[in-house]
Design a protein with these regions (language model features):
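N-terminal alpha/beta PP-like core and its mobile active-site loop of ThDP/TPP-dependent enzymes
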Residues: 1-312
Length: 312
């Protein structure tokens, strides 16, 4: 089905699209770039049209971590918007955390206007709009995000929103970065159509190679001292039970090294603690499950006869 917005602006359509795609909250730390967005929130409230709930947050780092916390509880990514380059710079600590923890967030910022003269909506109207100009604002966040894009035309708005959500939610999950200049956001239209629900399929979970799983099963059966080292397998709560069952059934000790999530209950009989170093010499099979650094080679490494299998 197609939904139509009449007599609006691109920022009206942007908020409507976010709401339609399941975005509940819009965490913002505003500046002059937010003018079209603020008008659209006011219009949505007055008319009762769909839009995420606006949350004004006093610091960018807090805004990012509110979105990360919401995802941790609900499994649904949210939107954060900050003020041009300075807001982006202030938010980078949170974006690094999102990237490190594979947490999807639709991170966005305004961009100083392009237009210096004329009557185009959103044009430069303050002195600060000149010093805020950057050659490549996306470069501030590019190393920490899965994808970045600058919106230049309403014709691609639906595609950009859907692609942003799709990329953020595809494993391994993580943040994306959108820059939103004032002129496109303030652009008016008589009619804007978008598809609801999205034409983009929900990202599916990658399926392991059955032959590789068979080989691993054979190695487990023949191992004398197998060991599992994990860190983030518990990011998916559905993985906790199977790991507990596997380690219990085959008596495989589990180490949660630098864990950011609960991967195995601490009272499980096969819970071997949080440091892998004391056990590397004895293991003849190590299964590394969703762990970035299972050991530090300059400190301790597995023995020469040990087989190492990575899963993640």
């Amino acid at each position: 089905p197609v939904k139509t917005i009449s007599d609006g602006t691109v920022s009206d359509a942007y908020l409507a699209l976010l709401a339609d795609r399941g975005i509940n909250y819009f965490f913002g730390n505003a500046g002059t770039d937010f003018a079209p967005i603020i008008e659209s929130f006011a219009k949505a409230q007055a008319l009762g049209t769909p839009a995420p709930k606006a949350m004004l947050v006093p610091h960018e780092n807090l805004a990012i971590h509110m979105a990360l916390g919401y995802y941790a509880v609900t499994g649904r990514p949210q939107v954060v918007m900050v003020h041009v380059n300075v807001g982006t710079a202030n938010a980078l600590n949170g974006i690094i955390n999102a990237s490190r923890g594979n947490i999807p967030v639709l991170f966005s910022s305004g961009r100083t206007p392009y237009s210096e003269t004329g009557d185009r909506e959103g044009r430069r109207t303050r002195e600060v709009h000149w010093p805020q100009e950057m050659f490549d604002q996306g470069a501030l966040a590019r190393e920490m995000v899965k994808w970045d894009y600058e919106l230049k035309d309403k014709a691609v708005l639906e595609t950009v929103v859907d692609r942003a959500i799709n990329i953020a939610m595809t494993e391994p999950r993580g943040p994306i970065y959108l820059t939103l200049p004032r002129e496109p956001l303030a652009e008016k239209f008589q009619s804007f159509d978008f598809t609801s629900p999205s034409r983009n399929a929900t990202p599916t979970v990658a399926w392991p190679d059955p032959n590789a799983i068979d080989q691993l099963a054979s190695r487990i059966a023949n191992a004398e001292n197998p060991l599992i080292i994990t860190q983030d397998s518990g990011a998916d709560i559905n993985a906790v039970g199977p790991l507990a069952a596997l380690s219990d059934r085959f008596a495989i000790p589990v180490i949660q090294r630098k864990a950011r999530y609960l991967c195995l209950p601490s009272d499980h009989p096969m819970h071997l603690g949080y440091d892998s170093d004391p056990y590397l010499d004895f293991a003849d099979l190590i299964i590394v499950a969703q762990c970035d650094v299972p050991w530090i080679p300059s400190v301790k490494s597995p023995g020469p006869g040990c087989t190492v299998v990575h899963m993640g």
